[in-house]
Every structure is written in C-alpha cells, then in structure tokens.
Amino acid sequence: MKIIDLHTHCNCGSKFDIAENEFHQRNFPFLMEEYRNCGISAGGFSYYSSLFSDKEVFEGNALLHEQALSDDRVYQWLVLDPKQEILFAQIRGLIKSDKVLGIKIHSLLGCHNYDINEYADKIFSFADELKCFVLMHPDKITDMVQYADKYPNMKLIIAHVYGMEHIEVIEQAKYGNIFTDTSGGASNANNIIEYAVERVGSEKIFFGTDTYSCAFQTGRIKYARISEKDKENILYNNAKKHFKEQFKAI
C-alpha cells in the first residue's frame, strides 16, 4: 500500500527551529529514516522556523523550495503570514511549481499571532484566485464554513482531526471544499478515525504525521476498523486525486 504524508515539518538549521531532544527528533535525516521504515514515499513539508516565528518566513519558503526541487521525497506547503505582503508575491510566483501543494497558515499565539477572522478574507480570497489548497492549524473551526462557502475555488484542510467540530464543518460546507487530516497526537483516540470515516467518508481525510511517530501514524490507519478502500483513500488515493500533477510519479 502506497503512502503519502501530506502534512509534516522539519527543522532547517535556523535559529528559529523548534528544539528537539532524545525523545522527539525533528531533523530531516531522522524523518527520512522513519519514512523508509514505514514505506512513506513522499511528504508535504513546511519548516518549523517558518511557522513558529514570523522572522524568516520568506527565507524559509525559498530554502525549502530549493530542497524540494532537489529531492523526490519532498513537496512543499508555502507558508503565509498575511501580515507580510512580500509573501503574497512570493507565493504567487511559486504556486504553479509541481513541488508545491498549496498554502500553509498558522495563526496561533506564539506562532504568527493574528486573529484568523481578521485576515480570513485576505487569505482565502487569495487562495480562491489561485484555485489552491490551504492547510491550516485548527483555529476557530466553526467559523471556517462561511469562508469555504464564500470562496468555493479554495479547498481548505483543517488539520489534526480531533473532534466533532472538524466533522461538522466538513458536512456543512456547501461546496464540499473542507477536508481534514490524521496528523498529530489526537488521532490516538481509539474511535476518532473510524467515526470520522463513518460521518464524512474517507474521501475527506488526508494522511499526515506532523512529525509524530510515523510508525504510530501509519499503524493507526492500517489497523483502523475501516475498509481496505478507506485505508487506501486516506493513505494514498486522496492525495493522488487532488494533487495529480505533484504526485504523478508516485
């Protein structure tokens, strides 16, 4: 069974990297060994330094794009801090690359520090114009339906499925343009994946690791109480369907 990790991160040697220790590694070579062990073919990356600080977002996007172009396993989410106008121009110039999956936003306090509702129209109208995916860390989830309905050419992945809000907004979106992913620790709940598949269908759920153990994340789907077709959709088919040009060789 092929696997595409649509949502992960890594450090890049920046002073704004996230600390790692013996218990949780965030460096690229370690993550690639995890990929090999678990049979993951490729990942959609953004640098931690671009998400947890607003100081090197432009530089991080540029550096990661170079890495993606030189490594078949690496695909990119372009990080957008909507307070920085230069990033809109950068993203516009890179979005058509076969190594780019879309836009990543991280509004939370301690990260880019903005009110998602204050900047939502600016972000999502831009994505609507580009007809691209936006991957967001969960923030004011129930408010996102209005923007998905307002900007139907934008597709929104609200990451880290963990509860009823994720499921309900997927059901409520008028144009079917809200999705979620399995990344993060919350998927360890023993019925969250199964319940989400029952309610919204496996076609709305992407696989991601978020740098949590690939063995745990892949095992959570492989041994879930869902059909083989549902497992294939989450682990591979959905990414392949929605990112045809990017993953055409996988």
What is each residue range found by the language model?
Residues 1-10, 17-42, 202-204, 214-250:
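Mid-to-C-terminal alpha-helical segments outside catalytic/metal-binding sites
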Residues 1-21, 65, 72-79, 176:
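Mobile, glycine- and charge-enriched loop segments
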Residues 7, 35, 64, 94, ...:
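Conserved, mostly hydrophobic/aromatic
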Residues 8, 28-53, 73-79, 101-102, ...:
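Divalent metal-dependent hydrolysis catalytic cores, especially in the metallo-beta-lactamase
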Residues 9-11, 15, 48-49, 79-83, ...:
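Active-site beta-loop-alpha junctions enriched in small/polar residues
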Residues 25-33, 58-64, 86-92, 142, ...:
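Alpha-helical scaffolding within the catalytic cores
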Residues 55-133, 187:
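Active-site gating/metal-coordination segments in enzymes
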Residues 102, 115-206:
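Catalytic pocket-lining loop regions of alpha/beta-barrel enzymes
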